[in-house]
């Protein structure tokens, strides 16, 4: 990939902004804004105590990581330290992944309700979401901005003109602020409404706004929204963001959850998390082992896999 693009001119004033909604607002109100704009900021979704706990739990991994240790991501600059698989490293992040508002949003957006036609009958079934990846983004001073992009490009998703339907979305992301995020220290750029664009429309930097947040808030966005990390121009300041990204259960996760999360940790996880990681089969036969649901006797299945 070519060199990273130059920073956005500091004199640029956005003509749009991201709607801010309390995390305890009615789920229908949150979903309506998400469908309209493609992204929003949920305020106060994580307590200050949990923000501190996440920072403490992940700091040892951040200290051991190298800024350039993300070879698979050529869109991430060297000034960014990424720690992968954080639901297996931070018990607090694993707990947050099961928050009611997060669970409801990912289910309402990503759960697929399907009908199968047989010779003599039809059957209805659902396929729940999966965890796509869980990561830290620690962006140091001088980190350049990313190119504007859509996250769903990893699955080769194409977008066509016509009536928009939220049911066609395949990805939903939550980026939690581990510190105060500002335009100056690299707050995520986003283009509200771009989730309804066709595949050929090219995003412009004069269409972006910035996901500026207080610690504990989250930028929630669809995989169809054009966005990108901003440029950190503040000396001695690191922008800390923690990401949880979910996909439809019919797609292959970006992060291989069977290898990213230690199996010793998996055995102690909830049924909800086992489903998100892909260890528990949905109502179809996806993910079976030995002709059955691996979650029914997970220790035995993992012992077999380790033999």
Curated annotation (Swiss-Prot):
Q: Which InterPro entries would you find in this protein's record? A: Phytyl_CoA_dOase-like
Q: Does the keyword Transport apply?
A: no
Kindly tell me the pathway this chain contributes to: Mycotoxin biosynthesis
- Binding positions for Fe cation per the UniProt entry: 149, 151, 227
Which keywords are on file for this protein?
Dioxygenase, Iron, Metal-binding, Oxidoreductase
Q: Which SUPFAM superfamilies would you find in this protein's record?
A: Clavaminate synthase-like
Q: Which GO terms describe its molecular function?
A: dioxygenase activity; metal ion binding
Q: What is its cofactor?
A: Fe cation
EC number from the UniProt entry:
1.14.11.-
* EC category name: oxidoreductase
Indicate yes or no for the key word Oxidoreductase: yes
The highest taxon in the source lineage is Eukaryota
What protein family does this chain belong to? Answer: Belongs to the PhyH family.
Q: Please describe what this protein does.
A: Dioxygenase; part of the gene cluster that mediates the biosynthesis of swainsonine (SW), a cytotoxic fungal alkaloid and a potential cancer therapy drug. Swainsonine production occurs via a multibranched pathway and is dispensable for fungal colonization of plants and infection of insect hosts. The first step of swainsonine biosynthesis is the production of the precursor pipecolic acid (PA) via conversion of L-lysine (Lys) to 1-piperideine-6-carboxylate (P6C) by the aminotransferase swnA, the latter being further reduced to PA by the reductase swnR.
Q: How does it assemble?
A: Homodimer.
Name of the protein: Dioxygenase swnH1
């Amino acid at each position: 990939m070519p060199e990273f693009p130059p920073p956005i001119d500091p004199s640029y004033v956005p003509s749009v902004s991201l709607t801010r909604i309390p995390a305890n607002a009615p789920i229908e109100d949150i979903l309506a804004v998400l469908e309209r704009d493609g992204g929003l900021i949920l305020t106060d979704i994580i307590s200050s105590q949990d923000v501190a706990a996440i920072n403490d739990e992940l700091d040892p991994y951040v200290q051991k990581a190298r800024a350039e240790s993300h070879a698979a991501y050529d869109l991430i600059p060297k000034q960014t330290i990424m720690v992968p698989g954080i639901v297996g490293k931070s018990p607090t992040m694993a707990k947050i992944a099961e928050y009611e508002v997060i669970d409801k949003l990912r289910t309402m957006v990503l759960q697929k309700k399907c009908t199968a036609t047989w010779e003599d009958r039809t059957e209805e079934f659902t396929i729940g979401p999966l965890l796509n990846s869980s990561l830290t983004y620690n962006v140091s001073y001088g980190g350049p901005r990313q190119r504007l992009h859509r996250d769903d490009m990893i699955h080769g998703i194409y977008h066509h003109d016509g009536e928009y339907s939220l049911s066609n979305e395949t990805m939903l992301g939550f980026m939690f602020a581990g510190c105060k995020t500002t335009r100056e220290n690299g707050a995520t750029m986003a283009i509200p409404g771009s989730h309804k664009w066709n595949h050929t429309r090219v995003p412009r930097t004069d269409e972006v706004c910035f996901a500026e947040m207080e610690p504990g808030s989250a930028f929630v966005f669809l995989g169809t929204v054009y966005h990108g990390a901003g440029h950190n121009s503040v000396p001695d300041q690191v922008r800390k963001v923690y990401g949880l990204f979910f996909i439809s259960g019919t797609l292959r996760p970006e992060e291989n959850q069977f290898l990213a999360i230690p199996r010793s940790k998996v055995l102690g996880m909830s049924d909800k998390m086992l489903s998100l990681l892909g260890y528990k089969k949905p109502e179809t036969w996806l993910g079976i082992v030995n002709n059955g649901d691996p979650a029914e006797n997970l220790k035995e299945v993992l012992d077999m896999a380790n033999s």
